[in-house]
């Protein structure tokens, strides 16, 4: 049964996807479903990114040399997860795998960035359901106008399963963790020093200044801390709920960036995430929760570095782990 229903407000203010209705607060990154085929287990959805509506975008300008703020990798993953969840509302999102981030999505003021999201099931017979998701964005001409061309920006797979309430499954965990304090060689960076780095070396503001302090770094290791915060991220939604904790993933991304800051302060280049082998999470973070961040480098070449990283709660439990996070120099 092909549901060619756009998501539209029903009298109760919910979104209508044909036979299932969704609350916009539960899917803040999906604006409309252009087409959904339950039998083939696939859907096409639409999302326009804009500074006016997406309050979080203005805070995300990781590089001073890029003119406009960017759609963050953390929110791209959230978009992927929401698309998969609409296809399988009875399942829980557990993570993503084989993610490739091919290009940045810049958001100039007054220019919305319309994007197409495609999601389909891949592989069957697993304990988990895997959905392949891709996001393509309408190109902007050199004059700053939208063209007819859509360019693929990122793709990956979302991991879901049906063990409701049981929490996520992290597998056998990451080898050689935890990162021990005696492995660290650099001095700690307190909150004041971290804020100074944000101000001097990046265009990150507010929500995206997620690092609280850095315990330090050593050969191939780094450790720090974040306090989890979520504020009102959307102009049109009061109580948006996410599928995972985007600002914890953001903190793990920034942690490996701070490795370079600590180990080689004279390095002027920046790093950008290109690939994520696999990300899994046990649960979502609570606002105000303090989380220890740690990462180990697994590979290094001329193009960049590959890492495994995790976030740990105050009980010592891993709540998010990332395997094969590949960062490239820019």
Residue spans for each PLM region:
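Acyl-thioester-processing domains in fatty-acid/polyketide/NRPS systems
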Residues: 3-330
